Design a protein with these regions (language model features):
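Bacterial N-terminal signal peptides
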Residues: 1-9
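Conserved beta-alpha junction segments in alpha/beta enzyme cores
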Residues: 13-158, 165-339, 345, 352-531
Length: 531
């Protein structure tokens, strides 16, 4: 959740460093750039898998004092120690919630956590960043930096959507006119991705895999849906790997849908939020002080955030119960992050240890990928990029409408089906429950009534991974789009979401692209008529 206090009100959707023509350039004005399609299926073969993690936590050079206690940098009120002697305050601006929130300390490392999965034909890498978002242009840049000798055929870079780490998009600088991106930190982030993938390739080991689905159960209290209709993406999905010879755990991918914002907007410490506790709990142990509550599984955990639009989050006043201490926690703090993270970790540990699911040493990647354009009708995005220049994203124009380029991937490996989505998907698109509420702006638009979980191949375990290879903001059903009065569900003001989306057609465009991937007919988009 990115606060409207960011001023530009385009939230988690809009940063990139150079892809395609600038918005001023009228290139092919009468037609979209053709989609780029990649389809490649490997035969089932022996698997090799490697895992690695690299911290990219910045060193805080300048210390500062929040004199008035408002969790924001106020020049002339707050004070700082000029650690590098350059005469200015050099802050690392925390992304999410509001601008002007520089880090005061480091609570725990932020990391690039990687797995590389090789079937002998295709070598596909996944890297998860403890970041709010990482733009498609940045992903393309890292792909170019990967040495060809690594043999990686596809690199996926995912952001957990962490709201307590330095800005990698540009929206959360010291004020509306300044980017929040520190160039050195951006470079360190990219290096961490490359280093993690390089190490994971070096650790490729003959492996066996299996998948698990962990029913949400008690985890339900850790997440709220803050916008009607109330639809969740509840379960935890796990892809496990073990050494084919020794049977020792190598690592796993864990996928769950909940915004990492347990600390909320007054926190000033860099942290991975609850996903850090998920990883440490599973990989090492669940420990409180000197007391170990549960042994971990070993190996390395890659945490991938799911369909979190709508908005699925541990909202500031949400009461959660720590299953190990039985403490009920309402205040946003590290105890809340720990309760959520260790709760998820415990559910995965128990499911893994109790599972009789068969392991498989052979599988083959079936990759179906599309790169395409999406209309960017949120004019604040264009202003932020082209006028204020606090973010960097390029556009093409077609018939006067700006477009961005993004990508969508359906990746199958045995029983595991990954849908790599470029933004924050509303869970009703994934699971069903899309509505046409009274007061919606486009009631005659095509209703997304075929849930994506039914659209992609059935059987096995589905991993819906948000903020993958881009961060284009909320992916909203057009029939629920609501910027204009009268507002839906009897609200007196517009709901949260639209100002953090690149446009009302985003959900329709992505639905069309997924239909093309799975060879389904693409229906008409319906009418723009509001009546």
């Amino acid at each position: 959740m990115a606060s409207l206090a960011c001023g530009l009100a385009i939230g988690c959707s809009n940063a990139n460093y150079s892809r395609g023509p600038a918005v001023e350039d009228e290139v092919d004005p009468d037609a979209l750039v053709p989609d780029v399609v990649v389809e490649k299926q490997s035969p089932a073969a022996a698997l090799r898998v490697g895992f690695a993690r690299k911290a990219y936590t910045p060193v805080l050079v300048d210390a500062w004092v929040d004199v008035n206690g408002n969790a924001k940098w106020d020049p002339g009120v707050d004070t700082f120690t000029d650690g590098n002697g350059n005469g200015v305050f050099d802050g690392y601006w925390l992304a999410g919630f509001s601008q002007g929130r520089p880090a005061q300390s480091v609570h725990d490392d932020i990391e690039a956590v990687a797995t590389v999965i090789d079937d002998g034909t295709q070598r596909i890498a996944f890297v998860a960043l403890d970041a709010i978002g990482f733009m498609n242009g940045e992903v393309e840049d890292v792909r170019k930096q990967l040495p060809a000798s690594l043999g990686v055929t596809l690199l996926n870079v995912h952001s957990t959507h962490n709201h307590e780490a330095p800005d990698l998009q540009g929206l959360w600088g010291k004020d509306f006119g300044n980017t929040g991106i520190d160039p050195a930190h951006m470079a360190a982030t990219k290096k961490a991705i490359v280093d993690a993938v390089t190490e994971a390739v070096g650790k490729l080991t003959a492996a066996e895999m299996r998948t698990l689905t962990v029913p949400q159960g008690a985890l339900a209290e850790y997440v709220a849906d803050t916008r009607s209709p109330e639809v969740f993406d509840p379960d935890v999905h796990v892809l496990e790997f073990r050494d084919a010879a020794s049977k020792a755990p190598l690592g796993r991918v864990v996928n769950w849908s909940n915004h990492p914002e347990a600390l909320w907007g007054s926190n000033l410490a860099i942290t991975a939020d609850y996903p850090g506790y998920v990883r440490r709990g599973i990989d090492e142990s669940i420990t409180y002080g000197s007391e170990k509550k549960m042994d971990g599984l070993g190996g390395v955990t890659v945490f991938l955030t799911g369909a979190i639009g709508g908005l699925l989050c541990p909202r500031g006043n949400l009461e959660v119960t720590d299953r190990f201490t039985q403490e009920k926690i309402t205040t946003p703090n590290f105890e809340k992050a720990r309760a959520i993270g260790y709760g998820v970790a415990a559910s995965v540990i128990e499911a893994s240890k109790g599972s009789n699911a068969a392991w498989s040493a052979q599988a083959g990647w079936n990759r179906r990928s599309r790169t395409f354009e999406v209309p960017a009708t949120n004019q604040k995005l264009v202003i932020a990029a082209q006028v204020l220049k606090i973010i960097k994203r390029d556009f093409a124009r077609h018939l006067g409408v700006p477009y961005i380029t993004t990508e969508l991937h359906l990746l199958e490996l045995g029983d595991a089906k990954f849908l790599m989505m470029p933004g924050e998907l509303y869970p009703e698109i994934a699971n069903g429950g899309v509505t046409v509420p009274a007061g919606a702006d486009y009631p005659k638009a095509r209703k997304l009534d075929l849930p994506w979980r039914q659209m992609i191949p059935q059987g096995g375990t589905q991993f819906f991974v948000g903020l993958s290879n881009d961060a284009i903001g909320y992916i909203i059903p057009k029939t629920q789009w609501d910027e204009l009065a009268p507002y839906t569900y009897g609200d007196t003001e517009p709901p949260y979401g639209e100002t953090n989306s690149i446009g009302a057609d985003t959900g329709l465009v992505l639905d069309e692209q997924l239909r093309k991937i799975v060879k389904l007919p693409v229906p008409d988009r319906g009418s723009e008529d509001p009546n």
